């Protein structure tokens, strides 16, 4: 048996790491097992390899995109076949995969589970095995690029937790979301490029590159807006632009600072006070030569129990069969249904609300980023 994650990675073909984990799990537990990953929509677990007697797919609402919050692990049992045991492979507060046993393990698999979580995350840099299993239908080139640029869906900044995801339209690819921990806090953002398909995806990728380069180079939010503006202009394509909310978080003071660039405003939710927009920091979309990017950021203290919610227009404009948009009323209903408000619960509620508003395919990517002080 492998004694550490790196030993698992010594497999000559890293596509076999998943099968090796299942083989060792079955040998240790004395029960048939299979490895599952979450799909990109966050609505089911899909079998990668293992016992054919277990289902190919298990419906579940416990995911944020393809990631499973550690806090939701116990509820995964509700999606399992009768008598089955589920063990999430958890790393840094979230699981990217789970082991499912057809019966109770008779041996101790705890050490294997801990090693396997790290090994699989490292192996993903070298094999598409897990990435392929997460897709329930083919992605366009634009949507594939979008997924490759995604940050972790669940993370911690100093003084806050972050949960985020994009419910993909699979052939659009113009949205991006991002976050990064920094000393004392971090950055987060959501953006949407005009149009659909490869052009929107290319604009989005260039803009995200400019955003990250500015952040990593020590710039501030105004610098980031200017960098995105210049990068989109440099493409020299007619009538292209990008909307965005760019924000930073200071943990010690519990302060959010933001710029709103022609995008839906950042919002704050509180169970007793409802949903409100944050005012200020406004400016035009980025990438149009006749318009200057905003330079005056706004700030607000985020109180305990409040949640910062950033969304793209794909959330607000998702329509029911009768033509009614999801809108802010849909956001309010989704957030009001949380049992215990948190970044993870809020992101999950919004994504589930958008997905269940109408059973038809998404016409636009639906993106959400939620920050909660802790």
Model-derived regions, located:
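A short, aliphatic-rich beta-strand micro-motif
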Residues: 72-91
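Short regulatory/linker helices and ligand/cofactor-binding micro-motifs at input modules
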Residues: 1-24, 128, 148-150, 211-215, ...
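Catalytic core of PPM/PP2C metal-dependent serine/threonine phosphatase domains
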Residues: 29-31, 139-151, 158, 200-284, ...
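Regulatory cytosolic signal-relay segments
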Residues: 115-173
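Helix-loop-beta substructure at the N-terminus of cytosolic sensory domains
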Residues: 1-54, 238
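Acidic loop->beta-strand submotif enriched in PP2C/PPM serine/threonine phosphatases
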Residues: 83, 242, 280-322, 360-363
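Amphipathic alpha-helical "output/dimerization" segments
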Residues: 103-121, 206-209
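Active-site-proximal, acidic helix/loop segment immediately C-terminal to a metal-coordinating Asp/Glu
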Residues: 197-217, 282, 306-361
